[in-house]
Amino acid sequence: MVVGVDGTENSEPAIAEAFEAASLHGVDLVAVHAWRDSHLTTAFTSDPNGVALDWDAIATAEHAVLAERLAGWKEKYPDVAVRRVVVKDRPARQLNAESTSAQLVVVGRRGRGGISSMLLGSTSRHLMHTVWCPLLIVHSPVAS
């Protein structure tokens, strides 16, 4: 079982479904958090011109993002062993790679209010065409 964790609250419903499914089927869970350098801010720059990035600090921060999103789930599902994967890569590419040995890939559906809430995000759309196992795209409730 594989779950994509993007670090936002939009991941929570997907994480919940993935833990439930892994527990129900008695399988391990792989929690994947992939990040790309194009999304980084100058918060991690060590150069006043914003050129050099502190890759160790970035990796530490990205591991913390995944740990924060998974907090509490292991206590709720003690029977589910979790392997954490944090990589600098496109989320769809890493999730697709993990899907080759998975029974199910679970991801959230991006979209923030209005018409966009009815659309799939780029990762979900990509995985629909490339994933090697069943794919579950979980709706995130729209905040009012």
Model segments located where?
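Small/aliphatic-rich secondary-structure junction motif
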Residues: V2-A52, K74-V85, S140-S144
